[in-house]
From Swiss-Prot:
Protein's name according to its UniProt entry: Small heat shock protein, chloroplastic
Cell compartment(s), UniProt: Plastid, Chloroplast
One GO cellular component term: chloroplast
Species per Swiss-Prot/TrEMBL record: Glycine max
Family from the record: Belongs to the small heat shock protein (HSP20) family.
Gene name tied to this protein: HSP22
Basic and acidic residues composition-biased segments: 1-16
């Protein structure tokens, strides 16, 4: 029998004057420019952050490919992926152990905000009762390119994986010749 659960995640659009407040106990990851031109544009403020993130990804992937680390011989998948396609941007984020209720996706101005968290505590019986606790937390902010339909973002959580789809708009560039005096 198929599971027909509604796995879609609510997406909220928040404008500048309507921002909430939150207390966070861990440093926030800086925005990552997912524009295909961000890494090529030497004046892009996100260029250095993208280089840092790429370097971190390479280091992480290199440590995962040492002999004996990957016992099964299969590929190790990155915990997230972004595909910039012709008509949409598709994203995948691994969020193991989280349910739909644990995840919040919103758009704040030109930023896609993905938050999630889950706490669990388990008591073990006996005279010396110990409990085990687990906590997982996600807080990611991505700068969206100008050609996105920010009010049509869709998110779905399936088997611990968050899928986000952002439709693109057709941006027509207007060129105005300026006469030099």
């Amino acid at each position: 029998g198929g599971d027909n659960k509604d796995n879609s995640v609510e997406v909220q659009h928040v404008s500048k004057g309507d921002q909430g407040t939150a207390v966070e106990k861990k440093p926030r990851r800086t925005a990552m420019d997912i524009s295909p031109f961000g890494i090529l544009d030497p004046w892009s403020p996100m260029r250095s952050m993208r280089q840092i993130l790429d370097t971190m990804d390479r280091v992480f992937e290199d440590t995962m490919t040492f002999p004996g680390r990957n016992i099964g011989g299969g590929e190790i998948r990155a915990p997230w992926d972004i595909k910039d396609e012709e008509h949409e941007i598709r994203m995948r984020f691994d969020m193991p152990g989280l349910a739909k209720e644990d995840v919040k996706v919103s758009v704040e101005d030109d930023m896609l905000v993905i938050k999630g968290g889950h706490k669990s505590e388990q008591e073990h019986g006996g005279d010396d009762s110990w409990s085990s606790r687990t906590y997982s937390s996600y807080d990611t902010r991505l700068k969206l390119p100008d050609n996105c339909e920010k009010d049509k973002v869709k998110a779905e959580l399936k088997n611990g994986v968050l899928y986000i789809t952002i439709p693109k708009t057709k941006v027509e560039r207007k060129v105005i010749d300026v006469q030099v005096q």
